[in-house]
Every structure is written in C-alpha cells, then in structure tokens.
Amino acid sequence: MTVQLTDDAYAVLEGRHADPFRYLGPHPEDDRVVVRALLPDATAVEAVGEHGETAILERVHDAGLFAGPLPNGSHRYQLRARFGDTTVDLEDPYRFPPILTEFDLYLLGEGTDQRLYDKLGAHPMVLEGVRGVGFVVLAPNARRVSVVGDFNFWNPRRHQMRVRGNGYWELFIPGATAGDHYKFDMTGPNGETLPQKSDPMAFAAEMRPKTASIVVDQTRLPLPRPAPDNINALGAPMSIYEVHLGSWRRKDGEQWLTYRELAEQLPAYVRDMGFTHVEFLPVSEHPFDGSWGYQPTGLFAPTSRFGTPEDFCALIDACHEHGIGVLLDWVPGHFPDDPHGLGNFDGTALYEHANPLQGRHLDWGTLIYNYGRTEVVNFLVSNALFWLERYRIDGLRVDAVASMLYLDYSRPAGGWIPNKFGGRENIEAIDFLRRFNAEVYAKFPQATTAAEESTAWPQVSRPVEFGGLGFGYKWNMGWMHDTLNYISKDPIHRKYHHGQILFGLHYAFSENFILPLSHDEVVHGKRSILGRMPGDEWQRFANLRAYYAFMFAHPGKKLMFMGSEFGQEREWNHDRSLDWHLLDTPKYAGIQALVRDLNRLYRDLPALHQLDCDPFGFEWIITEDAARNVFAWMRKGNDTRARCLVIVNFSPNVYQDYRVRVPFPGRWREVLNSDAAIYGGSNVGNAGEVRTLEGLVPELSLNIPPLAAIFLKPED
C-alpha cells in the first residue's frame, strides 16, 4: 500500500506528538481499518487477527514505522515483529482504551482526589483481557512524554504517552509487569530533552546510585495488622523511641539489617524497653545517605536500602504484633534538586516555585514546594494518606514546620518575597498544613500527627475548626534547649539558672507537647546526651539518670533517640551501628535499666500520663529552693488519689529530713529512685516508703539522694 506521511506521522517519528493515538494503532480508512506501529529495530512486522489470520505491514519509514490493513478489519489483533533472528508476538498499546475516566480527570483537575496513588504512577491491570501496566504522570508543560524501561530496552520512541485533560499523560503497556524498572523520558516546552525522571508516584525504586522506579502491585501487598486501639489517645502514655533504620544495629562488618531482620529484633527490644511507639527517620526513597532521609525523591516508596515494600510491611506488622505504634518522619517542606527528581520536572517549576527567593532553601540547598498549586497540595496530602492506609502507619511527624510557616525563614533582608498582605507568613503553606491535618483526622481518626516547630507560632496542636494548624502534638523545642542547657552546667552554677527548669511550665499546657531528645541533639558537634553531662565519671552518669527521671516526670509525651537509652558516649554516626558493646559495662546497663523502669512507671501510673497535656495534671510543690537545686511537684491523674510526688535534686549533695507537704496522710511508697544501686547509683533513699509526720498538714520527711530523682505515690 502507498502511505503518505502526514504531520502527525512526523510528529510521532520525531517524538513530539502529544497524542500518538491519533496516528498509531488502528484507524478507519475508506472501507478498511489500517494499523500503524512504530517499532524501532524491527525488520519485519505483520498483524495477526484474533482468529490467526495475518497481514503484512509495510515499512513506510526507516525509523521503524510500519503500516497496513488489519485482517478482517478487527480491532483485536497482535503485532508479530521480527528483531534479527527473533520473532515476537506483541500487543499493540495503541489499540487499548484510555486508563483515566472523565470523572477521574474532573477530580484531578479540581484537586479533590486524595487517592492519587490509585490513579497516578504505575499500576498492573487487565484491559480487554490483556495483562499489563497502566502508567499515568502529571507533566502539563511537556511536549512529549514516553515510558522507558525493561520492557522496551529504554527506547523513548517505543512507548510514547498521550496527554489527557489538565496535563495528565497516560499509556497502558501490555506485557509490562510488577518488578519492571522504568522512568519517564520527556521533551520540554521549548523542545529540549530533559533528564529522564523517576516516577513521583513510584511505589519502589532502585538502590542508589541507580534511580529507576520499579513497578509494584499494591493490591498484592500484605496489609499489616492494626496497632492496639487508642494507642495515640491524648490520655494514653506515649513514649517514642526514635530510630534510624540504617544505624540502629548492623551485621557482618557494618552491613545494614534488612526490614525483615529489623522485624525480628527491633519490636521486641522496643517492647522490652517499655516504649509505646517507634518513630522512624524518613523511610521514603532518598539518593543521599547523609541526608538521613530528609531529602526524599520517592515519597511513596519505602527505601530499597533495606528491602522491598513487602519487607517493610513485615516490619510494621511485627511492631503492631508487639503492641508498638509506628510513626514516620514525613518531609513535605522541601526536596532535593537531583536531576531524576521533582525539580524542573516537565521543563518548568512544576512542584517548586520558579523564583529562587521562594523556591530554594538556603540552608539545605533544596527546593521548596509551591503550596499555591492545587496539584502539589493534592500530591502531598495523598502521600500522607497513602502511608496511613497502605502501610497502616499510626502517625506522621512533620519535619521543619517552621521553615514552611515563614517566608523569611533563614533568609537575609531583601532575600524573600512577602505574602499578598505584606507579611512574612506563608499563607499557602498554612492552608496546606490545615488541610493535611483535617484530611488525616477525618479519614484516620485513630492516627496522630506531630509538628517539629521551633517558633512561638500559636495553636499548632489545636483543631483546624478552632483556628489551629490541626496537629495532634508539637515538639517542645524550648523545653529541650532550656533543660539541656541547665543540665550541662556544673551543679555549683545551676542555682543561677534555676529559671530554665521553671520557665517551661509557664507554657507547658499551651500546646499538646512532646518532649524531644531527638537525633538533632546528638550530631554536629553537640555531643551525645551523656557527653553533655558535667563532672567526674560518677557525676556524669548520675546527672544523666536524674535528667531522664526529670523528663519522664515532666508533663508531656516523651521521645528519645536510639542509643540515648543506654548512654551512648559518642555522637550518632549514620554510617555506624550503635555501640551496643557498652552494655557489657554496668554503668551503661544501669542507664538502660533506669529508662526501662521509667517507661514502665510512666505507663503504669495514670498520674504520669493521663493529664500530660492538661494543667490540672500538674502542681508545683517546691520552686524556690535554688540554693540546693531542688524541685518538687505533684503529677495527677483523673482519679482523686491518682497522684505521684516527684522530687529532683540537681546537686551532688544528700539532703536529710527534707520536708515536703503532701495532700494525703499515711504511707507513701517510693516507686522509683534514680540513685538506686541497680542503676549505678549510691543507693541513698527512703527504704522504699515513708509515712507522713504528725501534724495538721500532711508532710513527709525525706532523704533526698544526690543528683537524683525520687517518685512517691500514696498507698491506698
């Protein structure tokens, strides 16, 4: 047959056609149906009808364009192509119907589809009885988008996609399957060839330094069992063990543990230590180990460093089996500018701001999301819901919230653009955070969210409907800075810094606070928590024990970074395992035993957790004894007699016959003493219990151990 090449033909051949279906595939022509196929490197092609009848397709262009009539005019056919000495039967991707429905496009356009992970990305499916993978990607400014991968020898001309409404490109590729590697190859708006891009919605990715996405059949992932009910309730104990999966523990010469190996060890350890939750530093795929996961390129993909998505499910399931809630660090504030990532995705600033005064983070050299774009907000909200639904994560801790809230964050004068009212608040980011929290709590009411927010922004942990940002909790960065500064002082100077302990209680109930001793406090020359303690060896360990006891007695939920629970000496190094051998030495084992018992006490005594975020749960008893570095307070639960008296002595002196007033006469049992010999202390205390003195007002006479805290509860 004689074929006249049209503009559409040349656009397809040159890789600049927005809808190759207009030319490729079956098309009515006069009284017959003509099929056109672009098969680079094929030497001969014929069409095979559904009943086995064949018709030879003519090579009409040396680039591998073939055309000819279909046998019997049927739209159900295959292409039989010869490549050298090999003949292969292929399904023609250009004969299949669209993947996205008009309703899908409507929801995507208005930004109300919070389940983008069901539509975008790569999804194994069956169309017209044929198995393959449907690919969908947003690239509104690209002239051409192709899928390249294992299934087409990475040839960008082989599987050119078609654009649908609002810039969504799609293609069903027959024969592609789970496990295939792929990327998107694009021509930019000015005809330029762009770096091949990983799929923003990929559910798995190659191990760095490789960057291809991997097809995953989400419908076949095992769903982890749910966490215990009400594990995130405000009145429940919450003690979080923060973990970097790559350096918690290693094997065979510092090799990573896999997700499944972690599942065998980590949950049991966390439960034994008494923590209620684990919080993983970001597990989303990231190219640079040294970012600790905080510069992700694959927000929907658990990093392949430790295994597959199925393996990650096994880790979550094991945590839940042991009664441990799982929180993820989540990074919706910025992303790296690696060529395969989101930056300049379709040749334009699709996910980021085009203006570097808005779109580039000066501290980290990363790109900042443009929260003014509906597509970007929808992408991020969908990602949050994805982790909660598909992996049954129990909550998200949002990183670097302060950098999102303020347009001038870490920027010099004149180096930022004010909002429409002339202010420094990032209005679009505020709206995004409120929407994120509203969607999470509406769809997953048992989940929780927490903000790492270091400024005085009000109502971070208040509901959106009451004018807040909507988070469940806020990290108490002020408490962390003040108390670490105080405890690092020599005890003889602490009386001059007494207010650093008192000040935190002035605002302790303005938010639902988490007290964080996080990874950020044991890196970059800050030393480990133990490394900050002053004095000789005995005083250093006693200081640490007293500080941990003070933390667990203080209002607020608790968070401790791995290694701190046994007194890791050196700073954290993401390239090394924790120094578990230290536990062979009694003084480190004593720290670990204390943290285990503090967690147990915190869980078992309602007074220590029921009203963590309520001023009715706390009462100062002694605040003015700066000369002796002593503080005392009462923690309260919902029940009248749910009380716990806490006395903390931040001096190395023993105080005998120390008088403390209490609300109830009778016997008070000493339920924990951080100076106990089993923790490595000097064993000064009150022999396990003390009775109130005779008098009108109930009062205790106590022996206060040095650099220690004691906890007492009334006996019924």
Swiss-Prot record:
Reaction it catalyzes: Transfers a segment of a (1->4)-alpha-D-glucan chain to a primary hydroxy group in a similar glucan chain
GO terms (BP aspect): glycogen biosynthetic process
Keywords linked to the UniProt accession: Carbohydrate metabolism, Glycogen biosynthesis, Glycogen metabolism, Glycosyltransferase, Transferase
Active-site feature positions: 399, 452
GO function terms (MF aspect): 1,4-alpha-glucan branching enzyme activity; cation binding; hydrolase activity, hydrolyzing O-glycosyl compounds
Enzyme's top EC category: transferase
A Pfam match: Alpha-amylase
Enzyme Commission code(s) on record: 2.4.1.18
Cellular component per GO, a single term: cytosol
Similarity comment: family membership: Belongs to the glycosyl hydrolase 13 family. GlgB subfamily.
Role noted for this protein: Catalyzes the formation of the alpha-1,6-glucosidic linkages in glycogen by scission of a 1,4-alpha-linked oligosaccharide from growing alpha-1,4-glucan chains and the subsequent attachment of the oligosaccharide to the alpha-1,6 position.
NCBIfam families: branching_enzym, PRK05402.1, PRK12313.1
SUBUNIT field: Monomer.
Protein name (record): 1,4-alpha-glucan branching enzyme GlgB
